[in-house]
Amino acid sequence: MRIVFLINLACYLTSIVALSSILFYYTNLYMQNQRNQPQHSHPNFWSEYGDWYGYNGLVNEIRDKDMEHLNGSVYLDYTGSGLYRTSQIEEIFDLYKKNLFANPHSLSPASSLTTDLVERARDIILQFFNTTSEKYTVIFTASATASLRLLAESFPWSDDSLYLYTRDNHNSVLGIRRWATHWGAKFKTVDTKDLEAEGKEFDGSRAETVNHLFAFPAEENFAGVKYDLNLIKKFQETDFGDRFAEKRGKWYVLLDAAAFVPTHRLDLEEFPADFVVVSFYKLFGFPNLGTLVVKNEIVPHLRKMGFSGGTVVMATCGKDFALLQSRGCSRFEDGTIPFLSIIALNKSFEKLNEIGIDNISKHSWTITRELFLRLNSIRHSNGRPVVKIYGNHYMNDFERQGPIVTMNFLNNKGGYIGYNEVMVNAKNENINIRVGCFCNPGACTRANNLNDDQVEEYYNKKTSCHDSIDIIDGIPLGAVRVSVGAYTTMEDVEKFTAFVKKYFVDT
């Protein structure tokens, strides 16, 4: 009897253990599913955006297992720089460990392997932009800013040229005007409303010897406002640009895509900009590189003012002779290219493509929309808003607003709270955001209703971008920017909104 009892007891205990294991498994599965679903603040969230958020739970898996370097931080500065993944870095350095790479200015085995992977990186970039090497050239640079400087130095300016740019451009785009005026060209800024008129197709009378350049961002980096990419063909194929210039000429278009491409697809077949600048660290955190993508037909017309190793076939010492490389990228990539960083692009694009840029677009829009709705609903006890939000969020249009929520904080009387106070408190909560003007003076000063005279007066009182002066005469000199990206989660949104309520809502 005792043996039978013990056998029955063992079977009973085994059943309990098995049942507990099953219960534990399904409980964890349920909790994971619950976690994958955003805790939405408005009733239609799941029906509107449920299929867009989280890559079917993959975002949480990546955050848990592949981004250990976050260490509990809330990262909300994707427009400043993207985030790399642990596996991305491991695979890149595994590639370095298992292969011998060398200066590509040679035909040695190691150099040949290096060249092959560098060329593969160029092809991957062009494929990402839906074009080929038959139409565009990839010139590697240190950053988007370095790309813009290269273009500024090499563009064929003349006395009759006009450099036209929108107000909401980055400082690095504005800075091109110094090179333009050096060559006798003029510059002019335009507002969005100035670009709404239509142009007429060319009648064949334009002066091909006069080169004009129009620059605008696909998405401006202050508040995330998106521009209409149809402006590219409007300037290229009609006489629209000539209304701004003193002399008719050929218009080229520079597209600053640095803030745009980390969360949006850029199709150069549909929107064939003449020049495109990109920063890869904004796409996927590593490597820290940029590129200038140029139409092949334009490369021969660009000036190469000097030369260096890698850009010439041969030069003489006693007379001014230098035979430049015939290939466009080789002509403008001075010295030895950062080949190890360029090789890393291959693995970095693999990680991005695991998710897909279109899925990243949907996910980041979902996060942005929810963040805006939550922040916009926060009120002081007297009903006054806690934040003033800039941009096109109120349109609720994916095509008009990028993944940025830029704001200024308000007290319960409607006065501004300095952005430095927000930054200090955010640092205390291990929240990564950005404050200031974000190198976009046009968008920043317009948001705060500052004219050029006020800008000159007020900013002459500052000593640096990050000094303590953030409000003068009750007017903010910048703002607070929260930007999201591929790996932002609803948990990040919840933590930031909780932070706002904790520090800035009156009690």
Predicted regions and their residues:
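Pyridoxal 5′-phosphate
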Residues: 23-507
